[in-house]
A protein has these predicted regions:
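Alpha/beta-hydrolase active-site loop
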Residues: 119-140
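Short alpha-helix in the alpha/beta-hydrolase fold that links the catalytic acid
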Residues: 241, 255-265
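Conserved alpha/beta-hydrolase
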Residues: 92-112
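The serine-hydrolase catalytic nucleophile loop
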Residues: 81-92, 107, 257
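N-terminal cap/lid segment of alpha/beta-hydrolase-fold proteins
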Residues: 27-65
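Short beta-strand/loop motif that positions the catalytic acidic residue
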Residues: 239, 245-247
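Hydrolase active-site cap/lid region
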Residues: 27-28, 167-216
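Catalytic active-site module of serine/aspartate enzymes centered on a nucleophile-bearing elbow/loop
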Residues: 279-283, 288-312
Length: 312
């Protein structure tokens, strides 16, 4: 009987820890500078994923001028996408202002896109990105000098998969994408939350192991089963196009140090890795050094890299 009581207490602790963390340790608000959709110039587009028979929507940001332009297809992070998400819009507007076309799709099951990301594997989501690339290749409104992909957060898992399947991509960018499995990433995230709450390392490790496996599985069982053991490293090993991978040293969602270590161990000459001190999962400006939702150094790094890769 006592054993079951103990198990029940542990399970309840694991289930409610994320809520407690948010209530007891709320993040200190920062007045980040956010780009609003109303402040951008864009076209609403629609295209089709013929592989999985899905109608998809999105926003197309085209620079001023005649081109040719490099173009980037954004691969979304986890969850439902929103067209007014300031993180994505900050990147899209910067690239557009610097002569780069950006296709920001509606993630399947979001906004104007059919399908359901909750029951889709990374391989499924990669077909949506391939469809977006096909759309850009087929359009005749403006000339392009090259097309690449930008995987943001979870999209960093998908980006190298797309690069393996699509011929003639000009570049690949991963913004705070994990180089560990989703199982490892969830364990890292839960462990951090528990440590912040005051649990000792040994206890937090055990509770995080149970919590990361059970809470996410209960919330989204189909998705968890599809992606939990996905390993991105075999795809990164064979990447043969110019690739830029950016991490935030203070990322509490993705184990940036371990991710950078694994990537560097591949010794792939096509991959450039950079870690920004003082930035977390958004690659935001460090405290006291501005309030950009994505630090300007990272934005400049991405736009400069894309132009260089597209010109090769």
């Amino acid at each position: 009987m006592k054993r079951w009581i103990l198990i029940t207490v542990l399970v309840l602790a694991v289930l409610f820890v994320p809520v407690l963390v948010k209530q007891i340790l709320p993040p200190e608000p920062r007045p980040f500078e956010r780009v609003a959709l109303a402040d951008t110039a864009y076209l609403e587009i629609s295209f089709e994923n013929r592989t999985q028979d899905l109608a998809l929507g999105g926003l197309l940001f085209v620079p001023e001028g005649d081109g040719p332009f490099p173009a980037a297809v954004v691969i979304h992070g986890s969850g439902t996408s929103r067209r007014d998400n300031g993180w994505y819009l900050t990147l899209a507007k910067h690239l557009q202002d610097n002569g780069i076309v950006v296709l920001l799709p509606d993630k399947r099951g979001s906004e104007h896109s059919e399908g359901d990301w909750r029951t889709s594997s990374f391989e499924d989501l990669a077909t949506d990105t391939r469809a977006a690339i096909d759309y850009l290749r087929a359009q005749q409104e403006f000339p392009l000098s090259g097309i690449g992909v930008i995987g943001m957060s979870q999209g960093g898992w998908i980006a190298p998969l797309v690069a393996k399947e699509v011929n003639d991509l000009a570049f690949l960018v991963s913004m705070v994408g994990p180089m560990v499995t989703p199982r490892e990433q969830l364990l890292y995230e839960e462990n951090y939350n528990l440590r912040q709450l005051g649990f000792l390392p040994g206890i937090s490790n055990v509770l995080a192991y149970v919590g990361s496996a059970n809470v996410r599985h209960l919330a989204q069982p189909k998705l968890y089963e599809l992606i939990v053991d996905y390993n991105p490293m075999p795809y990164w090993q064979v990447v043969s196009i110019d690739s830029l991978v950016l991490f935030g040293a203070d990322d509490t969602n993705v184990p940036s140090a371990e991710s950078a270590k694994r990537l560097m161990a591949l010794n792939n000459p096509h991959i450039r890795v950079k870690t920004y001190e003082g930035s977390g999962h958004a690659l935001e400006s460090p405290r006291g050094l501005g309030n950009s939702l994505i630090r300007i150094e990272a934005l400049d790094e991405i736009s400069g890299f894309i132009h260089g890769a597209a010109d090769n």
